[in-house]
């Protein structure tokens, strides 16, 4: 039985990515026509690492950055989200090993400034980290969002 891959190993495994593909008919209903870039996990992590304290980024900005970088119409919404999640857990793995300079995953939001409850420690961990950096978190129905998050978005 082979050992389970660590989050860090998952992040490093590019599986032949990035690659740019034509948007399929099934996908075009929601995303339009053109091309989609499926990024390498490391690329998503690199963008997340660029966000300084007090600043934020959303998955949508990451996708736009990837699309521009690869001259694609869009960045893949599914894999970009999955790779951000892997990056978050790899960061916590690094922290557990005593590394200080980890990927600040708590600064990467879902669209609309929403906190990602799937990140390590859930909403509570994110609230503590984000409030410590000067952000105000409000509840909108079942979601938690950062008030005026647009004002804190990083320009890449």
Regions found by a protein language model. Name each.
Residues 2-156:
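Nucleic acid-binding interface residues in structured DNA/RNA-binding domains
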